[in-house]
């Protein structure tokens, strides 16, 4: 027998704990392998379907980069797997897939499931994003280079609109 009942729609994610992320942000990010912090500006919205939180960002040119670097992060909730999923793509073919069990207090921890093999990155540790207020947040992560050296990456972000 052929079924004619339409498949039910997946439940929309509950973005309530992440709504403070909507809007424009400026972040100063310091990597222990770079001489100075770099600046990223971004805008976060909810897509028209309500299933994705989308962040479009620009890492601005520095003395060690040739040009601005643009990227897109798309976050949703996988109700079947009971986890948040973040898919990132960027200039020069970069990509990343991270998952998280969700917010615990004022922090969310993202674990990389798949990373693009670029920039001498061999492995990563989870990234912790911490909400300081509705207009300030920070993040911390580390990664291992092929040489074995561990590199720390810390960001301080503030809302600009």
Regions of interest found by a model, annotated:
Residues 1-161:
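Hydrophobic small-molecule pocket/channel-lining residues, especially in calycin-type beta-barrels
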